Amino acid sequence: MSNVIIDLKNIDITFTQKRRTIQAVKDVSIQIEKGDIYGIVGYSGAGKSTLVRAINLLQVPTAGKITIGEDVTFEDGKVQLTTKELRQKRQTIGMIFQHFNLMAQKTAYENVAFALRHSKLSNEEKDKKIRGLLELVDLADRAENYPAQLSGGQKQRVAIARALANDPEILISDESTSALDPKTTKQILSLLQDLNKKLGLTVVMITHEMQIVKDICNRVAVMQNGQLLEEGSVLDIFSNPQEDLTQEFIETAAGIEDALAKINAQPLVKNLPASALLVQLKYVGSSTDRPLLTEIFKDFGVSGNILYGNVEILGDTPVGELVVVLDGDSDKVIAALKAIENAGVSLRVLKKGAQ
């Protein structure tokens, strides 16, 4: 039996506005497996939110095929489920948004209860479930508070509890942390990770922030202008991006752009000696364990002056990055570069010394 829970094949979504045709999503194919925390990342207008609305047919595609679990929901230009079946299928998918969409005149308890208004549970069973959900999101003591009495993070926790009320298999997060401060964002992401593990929940993260993808996701799709640019494991995408936009997202998340701007302003780099190179090194996995700069100095007499360094853990794999000035005899520097690449380290020359 396939472990794929969301299967999008060749999805097109087209709108017509004022006699103008807009293709919001163009021939996108994605497979998401049960238990994934899957990121769909792109700038505003990339088509990511439109695509994800098609997953539960809040937006009907123009073409392609969508399978959720064992059910084909859309194919050959037509919805494949009856109205009742579609409603039941949507209950297997919870959604949370940037704006929490809580009812201001209802308490946290009542907001969660609203999602169970069509449930066949008894009142006693509903009460037990609501209180259990509020405890799950660490809001058991806030059940009687109104939204105005809650912080942004607490409001999002209520929204998450409400989204889980009908025991969904999938939780879609559409920019759910965009309105939150960095500390609260980390807390919400940690909660989503816990729910993923405790409930076996498949989480789809729609975001424009690669940092969120790095923090929580195991797989990612990068979108631009309605098209899928590249897709893969977070480790593969971060360690070896194939597209310029992906590289841009990664550099923003790592802070390398700002670091390079400051590095290039340093006198050492501005007046780089003729014998020197400014290089960027990327390490993945076991290659982070080697004292590489020590080795190339010992073997080739080439010095390495570290101007920037960063090591992170993606999944269980360390990924490191260094910006280094290598200096030595020309032939020795060339030999050192080859040794670095042979060690499995990605290398990019940023600047050559003045000749």
From Swiss-Prot:
Part of the ABC transporter complex MetNIQ involved in methionine import. Responsible for energy coupling to the transport system. It is an enzyme of class 7 (translocase). Gene3D superfamilies: 3.30.70.260, P-loop containing nucleotide triphosphate hydrolases. The gene is metN. Its EC number is 7.4.2.11. PROSITE patterns: ABC_TRANSPORTER_1, ABC_TRANSPORTER_2, METN. It is a peripheral membrane protein. It comes from Streptococcus thermophilus (strain ATCC BAA-250 / LMG 18311). Residues 8-250 form the ABC transporter domain. One of its GO terms (molecular function) is ATP hydrolysis activity. It is found in: Cell membrane. ATP binds at G42, Y43, S44, G45, A46, G47, K48, S49. It catalyses: L-methionine(out) + ATP + H2O = L-methionine(in) + ADP + phosphate + H(+); D-methionine(out) + ATP + H2O = D-methionine(in) + ADP + phosphate + H(+). Keywords: Amino-acid transport, ATP-binding, Cell membrane, Membrane, Nucleotide-binding, Translocase, Transport. This is Methionine import ATP-binding protein MetN. PANTHER family: AMINO ACID IMPORT ATP-BINDING PROTEIN, METHIONINE IMPORT ATP-BINDING PROTEIN METN. GO terms for cellular component: plasma membrane. InterPro entries: AAA+_ATPase, ABC_transporter-like_ATP-bd, ABC_transporter-like_CS, ACT-like_dom_sf, MetN_ABC, MetN_ABC_transporter-like, NIL_domain, P-loop_NTPase. Transmembrane segments: none annotated. The complex is composed of two ATP-binding proteins (MetN), two transmembrane proteins (MetI) and a solute-binding protein (MetQ). CDD domains: ABC_MetN_methionine_transporter (cd03258). Belongs to the ABC transporter superfamily. Methionine importer (TC 3.A.1.24) family.
